Amino acid sequence: LNYPSLRQAVVPGDRVTLVVDRQTPQAETLVLGVWSKLEAYGVNAEDVTILVPAAITPGGNPDLRRLLPAGVREQIALKTHDPTDEKSLGYLATTTGGERIYLNQDLLNADLPILIGAVGFDSVLGYRGGGSAIYPGLSSVEAIRKSIGQGHEELAPDDARPLRQMVDEVIWLMGLQYAVQVVPAVGDGVSEIVVGQVDAAFQKACTHLKETWTQPTDARSGMVIVAVDQDANGHSWFQVGAALDVAR
């Protein structure tokens, strides 16, 4: 979508960094799919790094290489960003608001960064997705700390929000272009996958998200009853709280 074929964006010898958002459903399957394309276009496994943003809440780190062939799995690096390690950060640029932006070196040094992430409603950002897996999750402790706050109850998801504007500016400054945007379905399923230029893919995924996960009503309900049709395996109270927050 609004971007040349991946075949035209990469050549043998390029260093490729796959940034995978922690909330992405079927992430291992998506990593396998992206790798199969990269391999077909001559990219070496040892030139590929899978980079996971820092965790704001406690949780495990599944091996996103699990579905890759054994030989490939051993060659592709899997790293979780540590914002406390200042040596892992590099200076990107200064925003129009005077904010100095630091990002993970593996991301900055990549010839081709590819973003794989879920799109969803977010009380602070409006919509999670696009570059929100990169900033602040692949930045400094200070950047992550500044991003944590209460949602904007007075704003609708499509309204302008300061952090969303910051995220979009950071993505523009680093020149990131290629993204795989995922709209979640029930459970760990996938409703839609949009691949292409990051802004176009994000906007199209947001449109599908609204069509799939919103239910217009004539009046505000006084009570909502929610049924959970499966156990809590893979879920946490953080996700429950986030769902309640965006539903306010």
Please state what every model-predicted region is.
Residues 14-25, 49-55, 225-227:
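Short glycine-rich or small-residue beta-strand-to-loop segments that form or flank ligand, phosphate
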Residues 22-24, 118-121, 230-231:
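Short glycine-rich anion-binding loops that position phosphate/pyrophosphate groups of nucleotides
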Residues 2-17, 40-45, 215-223:
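Glycine-rich phosphate/diphosphate-binding loops that line cofactor/substrate pockets in enzymes
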Residues 51-62, 83-88:
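Short, conserved secondary-structure transition motifs
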Residues 75-220:
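Conserved, well-structured core segments that form the ligand-binding/active-site neighborhood
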Residues 45-56, 79, 181, 248:
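Short internal beta-strands
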Residues 24-43, 240-248:
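Histidine-anchored nucleotide/phosphate-binding helix
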Residues 204-248:
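Long, well-ordered mid-to-C-terminal structural blocks that present hydrophobic/aromatic surfaces
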